[in-house]
Amino acid sequence: MLMPKKNRIAIHELLFKEGVMVAKKDVHMPKHPELADKNVPNLHVMKAMQSLKSRGCVKEQFAWRHFYWYLTNEGSQYLRDYLHLPPEIVPATLHLPPEIVPATLHRSRPETGRPRPKGLEGKRPARLTRREADRDTYRRCSVPPGADKKAEAGAGSATEFQFRGRCGRGRGQPPQ
């Protein structure tokens, strides 16, 4: 598709800077939201990315009426050559995250003088309410640990099955 070179360069610059590109599948959208200041139509973004996809520069995903394009290593090299960028500049997806602060230094809650409440710590109370008892029964496993759960699954010990008609459909057979 013919498009102005300034639009193609704007699309390639944004893709190289971010490392990813998102576009809604709407060819009639007047401007792409991330390139609205440069007046680049959404159709130009979709077609430029289609061209890069056919060259193997991006990988495409589509979900919920949106295209997602991810820059590949070959694509970053191609865009670096196309935009005349030095090798020190890399897409944002290849930047290393900032150092992780240890959890002891960065707490989400402020410390108080009051001690934290003690939990049950594996002990069950002597008396459970009906709701708690139902939940407790559900959580307990009837199969001992280490047993084969798949062998235990199925119809159980019933070897004879019978079909009884319901809702007046067909003639019900008397039980045998």
Swiss-Prot record:
This is Putative ribosomal protein eS10-like. Belongs to the eukaryotic ribosomal protein eS10 family. One of its GO terms (molecular function) is structural constituent of ribosome. Residues 108-139 have a biased composition (Basic and acidic residues). Residues 104-176 are annotated as: Disordered. It comes from Homo sapiens. It holds the Pfam family S10_plectin. The gene is RPS10P5. GO terms for cellular component: cytosolic small ribosomal subunit. Keywords: Ribonucleoprotein, Ribosomal protein.
